[in-house]
């Protein structure tokens, strides 16, 4: 039985609970079709917009004395539960409609990072909503946040994004898979924790979900990693007149595109880097990068970027 890790992008899940649920309903059809064809899948997801909104809302309440401030790791855990719940509901309903008897479980997942990771001094991970430059400058002045321009879509707050070292709940994930459970894990890249003297402590950061998904896929010895985002292909010369979507490319070709500066930091670059990390550990595997809405067409080979060694 072929094993696939599917990583859904947080930006591709929409900007509201209703929009997210509607998108997940259609995506669940494609995911369950994989199960129906005999594939074993594990699902991860991003949380950039969602965790930013949760953190912003709770901070607003705290500033207006309507509740306590919440640390970022707790906000990450809330986003895992919120997104995981909607995924579970959509997948359970679709499994039932297909006559497939399978349990779906969301596992709150911690991921270990290094306390001395250089990312803590160089925030790069976009979270939350898109703002105008004027709005971003106002937040920077009032709250000390760092903002960057995000691929022509506006300005977003950025936070540290350390490298994932290990998945704390990996054994539990494997146990659930062994018992035939459809597992949703490592949401938002996992809740970042550091380990000192055998004690885990959460830290203020957001791990790139694609890099954690690549780590998970490698540990599970998956045959394929599917990264779902907001665009149908990986593009070179993105946003220019000579923009071109990549179909099937080799690892060496992708490395050249990276060296040529083709992919934006905090956007497509970490997805491509995650793909290469997985293929370095599983030389016989493959990575498919495509849009959430276009997953069905991508599985039929009509769209998407397929990366192989």
Swiss-Prot record:
GO MF entry, a single one: ATP binding
GO biological process, one term: arginine deiminase pathway
Keyword flag Transferase: yes
Subcellular locations according to the entry: Cytoplasm
Keywords: Arginine metabolism, ATP-binding, Cytoplasm, Kinase, Nucleotide-binding, Transferase
Signal sequence segment: none
Pathway listed: Metabolic intermediate metabolism; carbamoyl phosphate degradation; CO(2) and NH(3) from carbamoyl phosphate: step 1/1
Gene3D superfamilies tied to this protein: Acetylglutamate kinase-like
Reactions catalysed: hydrogencarbonate + NH4(+) + ATP = carbamoyl phosphate + ADP + H2O + H(+)
Enzyme Commission code: 2.7.2.2
One cellular component term from this protein's GO annotations in UniProt: cytosol
Major localisation: cytoplasm
Pfam families membership: AA_kinase
Superkingdom in the source lineage: Bacteria
Disulfide-linked positions: none
Statement: the UniProt record of this protein carries the keyword Secreted: no
Family from the record: Belongs to the carbamate kinase family.
Protein's UniProt name: Carbamate kinase 3
Gene: arcC3
